[in-house]
Amino acid sequence: MSRLIVKNLPNGMKEERFRQLFAAFGTLTDCSLKFTKDGKFRKFGFIGFKSEEEAQKAQKHFNKSFIDTSRITVEFCKSFGDPAKPRAWSKHAQKPSQPKQPPKDSTTPEIKKDEKKKKVAGQLEKLKEDTEFQEFLSVHQRRAQAATWANDGLDAEPSKGKSKPASDYLNFDSDSGQESEEEGAGEDLEEEASLEPKAAVQKELSDMDYLKSKMVKAGSSSSSEEEESEDEAVHCDEGSEAEEEDSSATPVLQERDSKGAGQEQGMPAGKKRPPEARAETEKPANQKEPTTCHTVKLRGAPFNVTEKNVMEFLAPLKPVAIRIVRNAHGNKTGYIFVDFSNEEEVKQALKCNREYMGGRYIEVFREKNVPTTKGAPKNTTKSWQGRILGENEEEEDLAESGRLFVRNLPYTSTEEDLEKLFSKYGPLSELHYPIDSLTKKPKGFAFITFMFPEHAVKAYSEVDGQVFQGRMLHVLPSTIKKEASEDASALGSSSYKKKKEAQDKANSASSHNWNTLFMGPNAVADAIAQKYNATKSQVFDHETKGSVAVRVALGETQLVQEVRRFLIDNGVSLDSFSQAAAERSKTVILVKNLPAGTLAAQLQETFGHFGSLGRVLLPEGGITAIVEFLEPLEARKAFRHLAYSKFHHVPLYLEWAPVGVFSSTAPQKKKLQDTPSEPMEKDPAEPETVPDGETPEDENPTEEGADNSSAKMEEEEEEEEEEEESLPGCTLFIKNLNFDTTEEKLKEVFSKVGTVKSCSISKKKNKAGVLLSMGFGFVEYRKPEQAQKALKQLQGHVVDGHKLEVRISERATKPAVTLARKKQVPRKQTTSKILVRNIPFQAHSREIRELFSTFGELKTVRLPKKMTGTGTHRGFGFVDFLTKQDAKRAFNALCHSTHLYGRRLVLEWADSEVTLQALRRKTAAHFHEPPKKKRSVVLDEILEQLEGSDSDSEEQTLQL
């Protein structure tokens, strides 16, 4: 665990000081102090280190030590969801809600209040019949509640009798249209009208107030009925969404209406405004500012306009909200704000400018009073809705996509660290770790794609919440982006050429189409013409002596040799290019198919657009180059964008270089600067441009270096052959092993005598499926002498309390399973004959002779033909030199990258025993059955086998 929790920190602790205390013990990846929501320090913090060793040192040093006057406690953190994690006891931690049981003796304050009210009500009931108490109440009541002409004496009984006739007398004069429309639903209207106190009954109203109340009610009732009917029609068209927005736009009005609903029923109509008029006057306060940036303003609207008229005016558009502006008196001002959902609807609404609505032309323009945050509209998504997918993203289940999004990564981590962490769960197909373009440091999140989705599910369940280099990882399922190549290939209208380019670009990272030192024939011809001060037409002149194809092939061979010499001088290991299945680099790119005369500055400009470059190696002639990036992410971006893209007039062929392509770490900028920018002028001064008939003085060291490298390769090949070959007498059979002895312990004992090639203990499964040792095993050495030495020295040696019984094993060692996947080791040179494969069918034997005769005198050139003996050859041939030295020189020159008629020649050393008579004998044995043996011969062979087995058993008994 590389993450620590530090408890009981002093109150004055700052993050800078906290970081400085622990920075002396290693690289910090996280440093945080914890505070409450109010900003109060909780006296603990977290520290993350890059490695566990650094965290252990810091924990050992600071645990139970003092900072100022506080004794701190330093402990290792637990992973999220760890069952051994201690339970939080702080008051700030979330605790499960448990209902509190009230004590038995205690009573709630609500019960006490109810008891007090009941007691007061009981006392008032007793005093109702008391006349003196009623007189006391009438005297002490408020003057506003009693008429000035009323009698001060107690006159309760007459008032009760007079109230009914008065109301009955004035009931006929009441207007049925003035009945209140705000009574509860389900009650009879006639009963409400008879029970409701009318304006004429209220004595405190004057005649003028009574008339005013009649006028306001009539106007408001008619207008409210019209608006309600229009609103109902609009709401039916818009749906429930508009209702929710209208209700949310005026929450203050709803509160005021709900509070004053009960008060307005008993209040005079003239003293208080109707709710409709009050709502209209209060609307502008909330609707001066547009709610979104997609708002248009309508000016010059009729004063009797409704939302239905606005909807008809803007049809077929469907506005999100319509706000009709009113002044303080509730009158419409002719301005209307209309909100739309996107910018396209706004542009269509602006086309309605100066069109007519109700006999008046309307001006439509964009609202200028828009919030400062221009661009996208407000994010109306809720937290529970999750992230909205982008245009090029599609949602897919983790069990199908196999792609993870990892965040809270340390800024000091690398792609290798992430690959090591996640490759434990399965093979990875892609790892995308974004970096900052300025600082070149990671952004703290990455995308991991597994080859098999079930491995991604396993990694998601185990890695989420784990501590990685001092920080707690957060892993989420990721979305998948649609690849542009698939879209391009799916279009039916695209031409075949575009489809082919998209397919080549998609397969650019595949290793099946890579050729390390590939050179285009057109670029080869240009380079040859520049080298020998000739024209391109002279290079392709078919009337001159010799074949044009052979001439281009020899020119390519010479250029390849110069490129190899240049790469060796610049610290490039050519041995890495010969390994086809080698691991590929993530930062070094081989750039091929460049036009002749390409400059290093042009490559720097092309590739430097995608990131920082390290070394750019461009040999003379400018046909093949090596470009090194400093960051893997930038290298992948350049590879993805530039593969098969047009450079000048030819497509670029890119290939990832093998790992270890540079033998030296420091870049040699001098070589890059010395690269000739004008090869035509500087060719005579360069040693590489010497014609074929002359040999420069500086060429010997390079030849010696090539010979040394070839000698090293031969030694390595011999060692590999020795490892693969199992000589007799190298394997020991060991008995009487302890069942607890492991293969590592046995190998450690026998490796003291010599180099152990393999060590195995025979095991079998029990009923539970557990492998158990059988008490014997085998140890194989590289040489028989080492096995004999171990037999003498370790006979009877005690291992885990058991004396070993050692003897030479006669069984043939079974090859390991991994040997079948090893690369084929090329044959050694035993003769002067070379087997040439992949010969183009249009090539003739004279062209093969012309090509190979450049390196020495030939003995024979044979191209086997088909079975019929007529027509073309079979695509391979044999070239036999007079001497082995000439054959070796030709093999080393032509085996790298020599193309004849566009096909690369593949060279191998022919078998010395393969002759014409041997081939005929082998073919006859394949098609004809061997002659039957006589019975006597078969019996003799059986007797010989039995005698041999008896002698072997006797020797074994003597040894025991």
Curated annotation (Swiss-Prot):
**Where is the sequence biased in composition, kind Acidic residues?**
176-194, 689-706, 714-726
Note the InterPro entries from the entry: Nucleotide-bd_a/b_plait_sf, RBD_domain_sf, RBM19_RRM3, RBM19_RRM4, RBM19_RRM5, RBM19_RRM6, RMB19_RRM1, RMB19_RRM2
PROSITE patterns from the UniProt entry: RRM
Q: What does this protein do?
A: Plays a role in embryo pre-implantation development.
Where does the record say this protein resides? Nucleus, Nucleolus; Nucleus, Nucleoplasm; Cytoplasm; Chromosome
Family stated for the protein in its record: Belongs to the RRM MRD1 family.
> Which protein is depicted?
Probable RNA-binding protein 19
